[in-house]
């Protein structure tokens, strides 16, 4: 950690006071969580802060996803808190989700007093052990003197290299202990990105210049390099595909955009990739939902792979040029060496394949249908709106149809695929971006996972609009069972009808059932324009499918569906 910016005024703190002081110094404005006995000293200190606002979630998992919503929209570490035992275990899913999607979080939990660890004390669990596989790094602070370095290191680690969550478990007696510090840690900064060789850049440029059928393949790791990604694509005329996590890096209507690849991607894109002779892979990890059967993915293509995480290079596909580095740093040196080329023949083949394998959007103009609803919602807002989703069919329909045109516009659970992500993430996005509308597309199964966070949205009067596609089923489970399992659909439908309108109203949300409106588009526009949280309800046929679909374990060219 850099030593510049330190002060030498001796100060006296309890552990809890120091934690809050450090968060203030770090520029944290919002913390979300739920208090409990083992973290009450921190909450006592937090109550005295004039700089930090606390958002009381209704479930610790909700707190974790609220923090994710903040971190995903501004790229900076966000903070969530919980007590020991069930508070900590309730956070696990949200933290694991952040790990797989590379989201910088600081998770602070209370723990039983250090002398009682290992005695099965009330609300004691091995938080440190549980969090090892789901965090970028974790700490159990046994002595108050460790706190300054741990807090500083945690923020540095969370945002350096490949971002991720850091978990700090702090026994109650460490929070109440008193110490004096003379030199306070400087504000934690990102560590420098790895250096890379000029030779690797020259090799990559030569491969791009020589390629006849190159494709640019973007993953979530390009999130901080939108301008240079676009510059590279346009200069070299590279058809560009994006993973679920990279949607918006090129505007949907950009002439070079191929849209999403993979299991529910654009049909023509999966075929175009098979024709490629070069893949320029930036910040992507070749996950199975994107590439299908590994050995049949782009069999004739050489690969340039740039990623900040060394572990991703060669993990799934062996690259011909591998560069461990920050994507933006690499592109700054690569773009001047790349030749401007029209690549007319390649673009003609791409256009031919797009005509041969069109991407129809059924019922695109009907706001009471799945795709039509998404289009109708998009027509009500501009590109400043933030879009979150839960996980399921509605997520894939939204990924396919919504006009995502900028980075950090699209928040979705990619790697872990967590139902219940959408609403609390939308709350976090609204907290971090109070001047923007936040739209949460959800399904009835997903919404019920964290429906209690409606109270959080209402209490804080956040401009979050929940667009609920209610098919009274677990849609993707229903789809896979009906397509691929001989016994058909089992345990994937909800036999009892739930009145989501009454539930939302009970939490204090405005409501609108589009199925009961004479002019659904006008009613949709009216409620979206209205400030504050709202639920917009539409019934969807449980037999609707997300197509195309690559069957599990199949190659991307073995898509089924319309």
From Swiss-Prot:
InterPro entries: Acetolactate_synth_lsu (IPR012846), AHAS_TPP (IPR039368), DHS-like_NAD/FAD-binding_dom (IPR029035), THDP-binding (IPR029061), Thiamin_PyroP_enz_cen_dom (IPR012000), Thiamin_PyroP_enz_TPP-bd_dom (IPR012001), TPP-bd_CS (IPR000399), TPP_enz (IPR045229)
Residue numbers binding FAD: 162, 264-285, 307-326
Molecular-function GO terms, alphabetical: acetolactate synthase activity; flavin adenine dinucleotide binding; magnesium ion binding; thiamine pyrophosphate binding
Cofactor(s) recorded in Swiss-Prot or TrEMBL: Mg(2+); thiamine diphosphate
Binding site residues for thiamine diphosphate: 60
Co-factor binding details: Binds 1 Mg(2+) ion per subunit.
Superkingdom of the source species: Bacteria
Broad EC category: transferase
GO biological process: branched-chain amino acid biosynthetic process; isoleucine biosynthetic process; L-valine biosynthetic process
Residue numbers binding Mg(2+): 444, 471
GO terms under cellular component: acetolactate synthase complex
Region entry Thiamine pyrophosphate binding, spans: 393-473
Keywords: Amino-acid biosynthesis, Branched-chain amino acid biosynthesis, FAD, Flavoprotein, Magnesium, Metal-binding, Thiamine pyrophosphate, Transferase
EC number, as in UniProt: 2.2.1.6
Catalytic activity: 2 pyruvate + H(+) = (2S)-2-acetolactate + CO2
Pathway membership: Amino-acid biosynthesis; L-isoleucine biosynthesis; L-isoleucine from 2-oxobutanoate: step 1/4; Amino-acid biosynthesis; L-valine biosynthesis; L-valine from pyruvate: step 1/4
Assembly description: Dimer of large and small chains.
Other known facts: E.coli contains genes for 3 AHAS isozymes: ilvBN, ilvGM and ilvIH. Contains 1 molecule of FAD per monomer. The role of this cofactor is not clear considering that the reaction does not involve redox chemistry.
Family the entry assigns: Belongs to the TPP enzyme family.
Name this protein carries in UniProt: Acetolactate synthase isozyme 1 large subunit
Organism for this UniProt entry: Escherichia coli (strain K12)
